[in-house]
């Protein structure tokens, strides 16, 4: 046996031991999950994870291997959380639309082992998470070309019981999908979500193709496929074309080549760890109040990555504001910032904590 064979044999022997230890570890995870279920505890415990990772690193004598072992332990904890969620019946995530929608693609990237549950509208996604029908909801929040999804931000404002616990940036390639064999000259009408239409505006104007908005891109593709009409086309992903038996006639028709949609993950469980946090607040209608808020944020040393305003529902000419800040939400400075903003703002609440 040469050196390579000996090394491989050693790896196989260690893997056999790891398999037995993995089963032993997952049995302990099951006990933890059952305890959490009995006591109504959340799956994710950020403080516990941090302690486990530090203890894991300390066990490795070879300093060069410590970061790799921490990654290994983090992966094991991620698997454990997925298993706990499944055991607790929380391994369900909601999205708007049908299979193949960009939200469905984002959900699959975020929760590869979860049951994806489809709802017709964003409102119903929020309601599903709020009721506990699903553990999470995945909805679009903003696009690098078409801007923010205002309706989703309004839903965040109207659901104070929900938290944003993660974000996911999905590169978007909008494609012109048609029935097999269709030529561009045959097309008379295009269907897609309003955001996809806006992202493809230059192409549509160039070929003078009128567009009709639909609830999402995958539903538009399904509609075109079921219509059997070669004069109709959809704007959607290449994955959607494969799902519904369509062809990509023209790829990447979006105006912005670097087209990205940010999705947010909703949960009833309050997040604790991250390097970004977002706030929603309202102000008295007095001169300089918004400037005062910005000064407070600056005085505490936080970088403000985003600020948006939206009309308050049922209150004419009054607004609420959204800000995203860079920093540790668990730091003492953050608690002090929120206390001061509580005096400066009419209302203020923490919306999300996540890592970017």
Regions found by a protein language model. Give the residues of each.
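Domain-level signature for soluble enzymes in the chorismate/prephenate branch of the shikimate pathway
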Residues: 1-356
């Amino acid at each position: 046996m040469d050196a390579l064979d000996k090394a491989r044999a050693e790896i196989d022997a260690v893997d056999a031991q790891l398999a037995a230890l993995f089963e032993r570890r997952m049995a302990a995870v099951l006990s933890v999950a059952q305890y959490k279920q009995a006591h109504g505890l959340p799956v994710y415990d950020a403080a516990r994870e941090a302690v486990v990772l530090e203890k894991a690193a300390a066990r490795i004598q070879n300093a060069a291997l410590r970061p790799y072992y921490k990654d290994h332990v983090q992966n094991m904890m991620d698997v454990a959380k997925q298993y706990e969620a499944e055991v607790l019946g929380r391994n369900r995530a909601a999205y708007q639309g049908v299979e193949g929608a960009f939200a469905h693609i984002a959900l699959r990237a975020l929760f590869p082992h979860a049951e994806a549950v489809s709802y017709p509208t964003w409102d119903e996604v929020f309601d599903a998470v709020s009721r506990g029908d699903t553990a999470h909801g995945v909805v679009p929040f903003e696009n690098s070309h078409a801007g923010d999804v205002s309706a989703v931000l309004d839903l965040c404002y109207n659901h104070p019981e929900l938290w944003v616990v993660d974000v996911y940036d999905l590169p978007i390639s909008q494609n012109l999908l048609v029935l097999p064999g269709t030529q561009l000259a045959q097309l008379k009408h295009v269907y897609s979500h309003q955001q996809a239409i806006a992202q493809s505006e230059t192409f549509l104007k160039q070929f003078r193709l009128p567009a009709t908005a639909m609830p999402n891109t995958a539903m538009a593709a399904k509609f075109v496929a079921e219509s059997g009409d070669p004069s109709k086309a959809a704007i959607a992903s290449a994955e959607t074309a494969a799902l519904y038996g369509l062809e990509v006639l023209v790829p990447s028709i979006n105006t912005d080549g670097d087209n990205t949609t940010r999705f947010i993950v909703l949960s009833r469980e309050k997040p604790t760890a991250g390097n970004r946090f977002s706030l929603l607040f309202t102000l008295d209608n007095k001169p300089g109040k918004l400037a005062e808020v910005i000064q407070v944020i600056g005085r505490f040393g936080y970088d403000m990555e985003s600020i948006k305003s939206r009309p308050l529902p049922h209150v004419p000419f009054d607004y609420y504001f959204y800000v995203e800040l860079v920093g540790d939400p668990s730091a003492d400075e953050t608690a002090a910032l929120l206390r001061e903003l509580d005096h400066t703002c009419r209302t203020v609440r923490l919306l999300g904590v996540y890592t970017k």
